[in-house]
Amino acid sequence: MDIATIIGLLGAFGLIISAIGLDQMGAFIDIPSVNIVFAGSLMVTLFRSSLGEFLGAVKVAGKTFKNKLEKPEDLIMQLVEFATIARKDGMIALEGQDISNPFMAKAVSMLVDGSDEDMIKKTLGRDIEIMKLRHKMGASFFAAWGEIAPAMGMIGTLVGLVLMLGNMSDPKSIGPAMAVALLTTMYGAILANVICLPISMKLTNQSDIEAANCDLIIEGTLF
């Protein structure tokens, strides 16, 4: 698990809740507002995307909670070890090696099978491009969701204000109605800035690191 992601997410919500106070939490919960912001913004995001992109985004979003990215120095050490084995015992000796990195395993497998350098570069380069596209689609989906959420929050606030102004005959109801109307704006800001946009940025960063690691593996394998 990626500890930084867990601490950041729980810490952000913890600070918001502590600012509100547990005894006041009931005043900040409104189901229609939740539906407008969370469900409404998701529906609009689906409208501008596709179901496949949504399912792919949910899948890659899980990467933000995992810490599977290897350090470049660890990859270099492993590649040096494989080079030493190949030099002493031949390429075929690499076939029995336990390789946890799927990309490196494919690169070594192609090398052992006798694939030429151009074929390895083209095949693995295409795999990198497909991976980057998949990650980009996931990051773009959450970026779009984060862009739409505040707008849906504002729509919810306007709906609440219209309903409030339509019931001005009871002055005592104006304050509570105004508070409920403003909740959708708060929900939109939280959904965008605490959840969607951080996930989008983290996916982009992880994609860049993973692509750099894959390039390193290609260079190390063909050296």
Positions of predicted regions on the chain:
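Large intracellular
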Residues: 4-7, 14-139, 210-223
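Helix-termination/interfacial motifs at the ends of transmembrane alpha-helices
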Residues: 2, 7-25, 127-207
